[in-house]
Amino acid sequence: MKINKDEVEKVALLARLELTGEEAEMFTGQMDAILAYVDKLNELNTDGIVPTAHAVPMENAFRADEVRDSIGIDNALANAPKRAESFFRVPKVIE
């Protein structure tokens, strides 16, 4: 598949990018090379190959939950600029 400068400029417009003429020419060549590589990949015979989403067949590996001692409220709030009882006090951001 061949891409031309007009198509690159259209993609840039859709992406809200402002390209100079020189950049459009450069990206035309780069995108053309990328699409040529994709065309080459499309020529591969993938019959009998199982589609995969990940290279490693691994699912989430969670550790078992275990109860631990916490650092405590006083230690957690020790470096807080402002605090109110056992809470961080932060500036109001919503009116």
Swiss-Prot record:
Keyword Ligase appears in the UniProt entry: yes
Superkingdom, natural source: Bacteria
UniProt key word Cytoplasm: no
Catalytic EC class: ligase
Record EC number: 6.3.5.-
Pfam families per the UniProt record, alphabetical: GatC (PF02686)
Record-linked NCBIfam families: gatC
Stated name of the protein: Aspartyl/glutamyl-tRNA(Asn/Gln) amidotransferase subunit C
Organism: Geotalea daltonii (strain DSM 22248 / JCM 15807 / FRC-32)
Name of the coding gene: gatC
